[in-house]
Amino acid sequence: MAMSPAATVARRRLAAASQGSHEGGARTWKILSFVLALPGVGVCMANAYMKMQAHSHDPPEFVPYPHLRIRTKPWPWGDGNHSLFHNAHTNALPTGYEGPHH
């Protein structure tokens, strides 16, 4: 099966490229990092910042579902109602959220 002249030329160039040295590899990745990666990170940071500014920071309305926040016995630390990793800004108690949020 004969190859077309264009396919033969392309095959020779690709074969020659694989035989060549790796001198420009680090330079290529350095250019790609500065031209693509850093601006990409900047765009992602700007997107996250704009979404944070548009986001409502009020907690959702508390609904006391009976299957959540069940306390059959108190926790062995503190007042017994707060888990070890309790966060007053995000975690609700069985009676609702604690105090005002900022």
Curated annotation (Swiss-Prot):
Residues 15-25 are mitochondrial matrix. InterPro entries: Cyt_c_oxidase_su6a, Cyt_c_oxidase_su6a_CS, Cyt_c_oxidase_su6a_sf. Pathway: Energy metabolism; oxidative phosphorylation. Keywords: Membrane, Mitochondrion, Mitochondrion inner membrane, Oxidoreductase, Transit peptide, Transmembrane, Transmembrane helix. It is a single-pass membrane protein. The chain crosses the membrane at residues 26-50. Residues 1-14 form a transit peptide. It is found in: Mitochondrion inner membrane. GO terms for biological process: mitochondrial electron transport, cytochrome c to oxygen. GO terms for molecular function: enzyme regulator activity; oxidoreductase activity. The keyword Mitochondrion applies. Residues 51-102 are mitochondrial intermembrane. The keyword tRNA-binding does not apply. Pfam families: COX6A. Residues 1-25 are annotated as: Disordered. One of its GO terms (cellular component) is mitochondrial inner membrane. PROSITE patterns: COX6A (PS01329). Its main location: mitochondrion. Component of the cytochrome c oxidase (complex IV, CIV), a multisubunit enzyme composed of 14 subunits. The complex is composed of a catalytic core of 3 subunits MT-CO1, MT-CO2 and MT-CO3, encoded in the mitochondrial DNA, and 11 supernumerary subunits COX4I, COX5A, COX5B, COX6A, COX6B, COX6C, COX7A, COX7B, COX7C, COX8 and NDUFA4, which are encoded in the nuclear genome. Component of the cytochrome c oxidase, the last enzyme in the mitochondrial electron transport chain which drives oxidative phosphorylation. The respiratory chain contains 3 multisubunit complexes succinate dehydrogenase (complex II, CII), ubiquinol-cytochrome c oxidoreductase (cytochrome b-c1 complex, complex III, CIII) and cytochrome c oxidase (complex IV, CIV), that cooperate to transfer electrons derived from NADH and succinate to molecular oxygen, creating an electrochemical gradient over the inner membrane that drives transmembrane transport and the ATP synthase. Belongs to the cytochrome c oxidase subunit 6A family. This is Cytochrome c oxidase subunit 6A, mitochondrial. It comes from Cyprinus carpio (Common carp).
